[in-house]
């Protein structure tokens, strides 16, 4: 009987090791490099993820291929900012793991990175969270979608989805969280990952992360004719865009671009612009920020 249990135990262990090896994960469930002797398989780096070996035909992987996350590394390299290795923490899966590990002759940096924001940025085989997430859903996206990532440089707003959603960090405006902060316990995934059929490849939601505003009505939250988000959102966007143009005109004409009034007005403008362009994660806060910037016009002339 002991021999039977020993055999079963060894079989389970070998199966687990095989699973992690195939998927590109080590025994602690984090992304790991291919063996150094296999570097020839990838002339650029041994750090590539291998999730597509098993998941390439699944809807989640196919959706991700067309999502912004799959272009994160290319966007970084070809973007307008000076690229630093630390930028990889949000633009390339594996940086947080490999930056602390030494592989002879293979440093994880902007020249050797090949992964975009791929599977291991959000998932781990050893996680006890729902969907094997590395963190609870409400805490995951804000790791990168925030102002203080440092990629763009000190004082430059790179992106501001988190701060806009929570309604904070702007100049001259009291804290104003979006009503969705309380209503949506899982935060971002409610809008950006909602999809009707998990077994089909979607154009919105899922791993496309493209918000489908029709769900605002079908969820029962905005189901009245006067409160239809598919109709109202373009109106909100046009209003915010008009204010942004007015603020930009004032900023461009300001003679002193070092004054506190200028810095405050520009911060608010950059926050709204950094929130996917139009502050749609918190429309009342976006309007309040721009209104305050417009109120500084006389001080900026």
Which ranges hold each PLM region?
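Short sequence/structural segments immediately N-terminal
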Residues: 5, 20-301
């Amino acid at each position: 009987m002991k021999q039977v249990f020993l055999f079963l135990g060894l079989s389970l262990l070998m199966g687990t090791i095989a699973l992690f090896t195939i998927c590109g994960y080590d025994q602690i469930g984090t992304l790991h490099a291919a063996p150094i002797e296999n570097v020839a398989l990838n002339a650029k780096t041994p750090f590539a993820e291998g999730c597509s070996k098993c998941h390439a035909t699944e809807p989640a992987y196919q959706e991700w291929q067309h999502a912004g996350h799959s272009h994160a590394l290319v966007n970084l390299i070809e973007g307008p900012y000076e690229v630093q290795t630390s930028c990889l923490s949000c633009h390339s899966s594996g940086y947080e793991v490999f930056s602390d590990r030494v592989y002879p002759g293979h440093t994880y940096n902007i020249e050797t990175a090949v992964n975009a924001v791929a599977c291991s940025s959000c998932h781990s085989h050893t996680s006890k969270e729902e969907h094997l997430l590395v963190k609870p859903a409400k805490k995951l996206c804000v790791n990168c979608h925030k102002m203080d990532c440092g990629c763009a440089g000190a004082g430059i707003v790179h992106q501001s989805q988190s701060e806009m959603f929570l309604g904070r960090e702007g100049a001259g405006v009291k804290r104003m969280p979006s009503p969705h902060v309380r209503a949506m316990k899982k935060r971002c995934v409610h809008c950006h990952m909602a999809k009707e059929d998990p077994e089909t490849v979607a154009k919105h939601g899922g791993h496309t992360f493209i918000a489908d505003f029709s769900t605002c009505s079908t969820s029962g939250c905005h189901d009245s004719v006067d409160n239809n988000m598919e109709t109202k959102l373009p109106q909100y966007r046009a209003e915010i865009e008009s204010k942004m143009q007015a603020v930009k005109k004032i900023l461009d004409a300001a003679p002193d671009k070092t004054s506190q009034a200028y810095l405050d007005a520009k911060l608010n403008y950059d926050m709204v612009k950094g929130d996917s362009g139009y502050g749609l994660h918190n429309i009342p806060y976006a309007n309040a920020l721009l209104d305050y910037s417009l109120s500084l016009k006389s001080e900026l002339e």
